[in-house]
Regions:
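Redox-cofactor-proximal catalytic regions of oxidoreductases
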Residues: 34-63
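Short, basic/glycine-rich phosphate-binding loops at helix/coil junctions
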Residues: 56-66, 225-230
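Flavin (primarily FAD) cofactor-binding/catalytic cores of flavoenzymes
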Residues: 1-33, 37-40, 44-45, 69-353
């Protein structure tokens, strides 16, 4: 199992429940220095109360903790890291970290997982690989004319630490999701000037108006893309943004009023097609991530459309490669459901070898 975030831990829990022994029948490798998956890298100001709803991992009730009752004022990265640490210890999942998987390749009928660890490089010969690497390690910044000539700072969501580093600066925030909105609200009053740009209009919805049908359609679109091997579409673009009191206050102040996307980047700012120019010391790219799949390149699983065809949790091209937390499974509740399904399929496959 490559990755010990929500998807990897969920699969590992069910593998153990189905009779496999952690550390001998299966191993979990994780690149992070500590527990928490991608959450351990989130910015300090992101609180449990303002983060996307985090569903409990399967069996978490056995250790007496729940994200539903966690202190909403605490940093999300700290709470998740703590709960996941307790989870790993309680279920004795024996996660090996920090271990970075460099490649997965074929050797006869076996799969070989090559890795780097603090003790040196090595390899594991295995029958099955569950890829649960998520997306955090593969940030996406779209190309615009002048991108590489910008004299200021390019900062992606993955690199953002706190508003303090932008004190008194002219900042452009790019993106239409909750991360972009969170940065804007945090930077308001700290940055000298804030400009929000997005590729598409932002739909703010009251709590009772949240479009569940659109959300279901967005997840279905992710599933269809995964099955066809296409690039995975955005979920947020199909579901809208909840209009909380904090967000409404930001709208009323004029902080959360997006402009259309600029057409080019210049050394000292950004320019729109109509000639309007905005000086910028930094551009924060809240433009999402792509699945982290580089280590699987030797297996030649990619389709010409750019993605990997995945159905019912496994690769169409190689049924020994499973994908947890991929496409429609990316949410915490989706990862839990998929974890059970993938674990059952893995055990069934192993029993036939």
């Amino acid at each position: 199992v490559i990755g010990a975030g929500q998807a990897g831990l969920s699969v590992s829990f069910y593998l153990q429940r189905l009779g496999l022994e952690p550390g001998s029948d299966f191993v979990v490798l994780d690149r992070g220095p500590g527990t928490g998956g991608a959450w351990q890298h989130r910015w300090e100001a992101l609180r449990i109360g303002s983060a996307h709803h985090i569903n409990d991992l399967p069996g978490m009730d056995e250790i007496g903790v729940s994200f539903d009752t966690a202190d909403r004022t605490q940093p999300a990265r700290d709470v998740v890291a703590d709960y996941y640490s307790r989870y790993e210890e309680h279920f004795r999942l024996r996660v090996f970290r920090p271990v970075e998987v460099k490649c997965v390749s074929n050797r006869g009928t076996d799969l070989v997982v090559g890795f780097d660890a603090s003790t040196g490089s090595g390899e594991i010969v295995t029958d099955v690989v569950v890829n649960a690497t998520g997306t955090w390690g593969s940030p996406f910044i779209p190309w615009y004319p002048g991108l590489t000539g910008f004299a200021g700072r390019h900062v992606h969501t993955a690199d953002y630490a706190s508003a303090a580093e932008f004190e008194g600066r002219n900042v452009v925030v790019v993106g239409g999701g909750t991360s972009a909105i969170g940065f804007l609200l945090e930077l308001d009053g700290s940055a000298s000037n804030l400009t929000w740009v997005a590729r598409r209009p932002i739909e703010f919805l009251d709590e009772g108006e949240l479009n569940m049908e659109a959300g279901t359609a967005a997840v279905a679109a992710q599933d269809a893309a995964a099955r066809a091997g296409r690039a995975l579409p955005s979920i947020v673009s199909g579901t809208g943004v909840p209009r909380t009191r904090r967000i409404q206050a930001g709208i009323d102040r004029g902080t959360l009023v997006p402009r259309p996307m600029f057409s080019s980047i210049e050394p000292d700012g950004v320019r729109w097609a109509d000639g309007t120019f905005q000086p910028a010391d930094a551009i924060i790219w809240s433009t999402g991530f792509r699945p982290e799949l580089r280590h699987l390149a030797p297996l030649k699983l990619r389709e010409k459309e750019g993605g990997i065809s995945v159905g019912a949790g496994s690769s169409w091209k190689d049924g020994r490669i499973f994908f947890a937390g991929y496409g429609p499974q990316a949410s915490t509740i989706g990862a839990n459901r998929a974890g059970r399904q993938i674990a059952r399929q893995v055990v069934a496959l192993l029993s036939n070898l």
